[in-house]
Amino acid sequence: MTVKTRFAPSPTGYLHIGGVRTALFSWAFARHHKGEFLLRIEDTDLARSTAESVNIILDGMKWVGLNYDNADNVVYQTRRFDRYKEVIAELLEKGHAYYCYCSKEELEAMREKAEKEGSATYDRRWRPEVGKTLPEIPSDVQPVVRFKTPLDGVTKWTDLVKGEISIPNEALDDLIIARADGTPTYNFCVVVDDYDMGVTHVIRGDDHVNNTPKQINILKAIDANLPEYGHLPMILNEQGKKISKRSGDTVAITDFGAMGILPEAMLNYLARLGWAHGDDEFFTMEQFIEWFDLKDVSPSPSRMDLKKLYWINGEHIKITPNGKLAELVKPRLALRDIHETEKPALEDVLELVKDRPQDLNTLADECFYFYVKQTPAEADVQKHWDDEAAARMLRFAERLEGLEDWNAEAIHDLFKPFCDEEGIKMGKLGMPLRLAVCGTAKTPSVDAVLALIGKEEVLKRIRA
């Protein structure tokens, strides 16, 4: 059997990080088992689904690098209405579905009664049964189509995350599978799609647990093989509450990109939300695919920790090739009006500075002063700069100007003799020198920084 999983987002807004985590686990499960990972766009909500939102999903999947095997044949539910109608007709013909002519007023009365009695909402008055007389068909009501849910027994499955789950069928409604206008409903479309796509494992959020028995019963009615189900725990915010944009939480995957998070780091972090492989925190996607098993997914909710995300991002920045980092940093430098990054070469700059920043925006800040001197912070000026420091910088510039070989080692060899002559410690030279050349007191080794910036530019900045 070829394992087939799917990710099935609705294009009604941004691509949520919870959705990306679901896609990641589905993708990793398929890749681990040498199977297929498929994408389906559930766009039957015509009022809310937009082409822009579809593009947001596709762009988000591309950004994080979750490649799907049906890229040339993505399934769109709105293109499958004829297929849904065909299956509904089959269910009606075989007696697994029926027309319901209840008015809105009747349904509202049933709903109120059900809330009081704790029973299923619909009283099945239009459900055909042996010896039962159905009401007279009203002339002013367009019928919906309802599925005939079994009245006895239980619907159960062994959830790949939550374990054994059993739901009494008497607790289930005869759900609507086609609205009065003929459009199919969510739970029905999902079943037909999973069946036609050959999905073997449905991995999704645990907010879908209640949909599962309904979908299993429909699958049985169409004589389909049942997929296995795994329901993933919710992701909570740092306060332990449901993630919400309204609460100020970052929820859209594209927002994390704007924050300077690498896609590899984002996936690494999301993988650790609810899944664990020993104490491993930092790993590649190749390792994740090798290690991933749904039995290692906790059924308990996970909590966001932005500090941990940034730490993981910093670790990924360290191992990212400088050429790739340069392409990511250049647009951020361009926003600061830095368009020429040849002198010094940006890749050389990144090699020097990339061990400290934990996001690409901060990394760009670290590169900035190699091309343009920053305006020093007032606190740094107060602490490290005065008239004597200014005079000392001019004297040290003369030593620098006398160097024939301009490299970090030659520059470093000037420090101790100069400090001895001046009767100062290295801090009295190094910190003002950083301010004079870079405009900041926080840089990597100052000799390496000066070597990269170049002799002419260093002398120009000191003497400015």
Swiss-Prot record:
Instruction: Cite a single Pfam family from the UniProt record.
Output: Anticodon_2
Q: Which residues cross the membrane?
A: none
List GO BP terms, alphabetically: glutamyl-tRNA aminoacylation
Asked whether the keyword Ribonucleoprotein is assigned, the reply is: no
* EC number(s) reported in the record: 6.1.1.17
**What does the record give under GO molecular function?**
ATP binding; glutamate-tRNA ligase activity; tRNA binding; zinc ion binding
**Major location, coarse class?**
cytoplasm
What SUPFAM superfamilies does the annotation carry?
A: An anticodon-binding domain of class I aminoacyl-tRNA synthetases, Nucleotidylyl transferase
Disulphide-bonded residues: none
> Where is this chain's protein located in or outside the cell?
Cytoplasm
**Residues where ATP binds:** K245
- Gene3D superfamilies registered for this protein in UniProt: 1.10.10.350, HUPs
**Annotated motif 'HIGH' region, positions:** 9-19
* Subunit description: Monomer.
What family is this protein classified in? Belongs to the class-I aminoacyl-tRNA synthetase family. Glutamate--tRNA ligase type 1 subfamily.
PANTHER family, A to Z? GLUTAMATE--TRNA LIGASE, GLUTAMATE--TRNA LIGASE, MITOCHONDRIAL-RELATED
General function of this protein: Catalyzes the attachment of glutamate to tRNA(Glu) in a two-step reaction: glutamate is first activated by ATP to form Glu-AMP and then transferred to the acceptor end of tRNA(Glu).
Q: This protein is called what?
A: Glutamate--tRNA ligase
Question: Gene name on record?
Answer: gltX
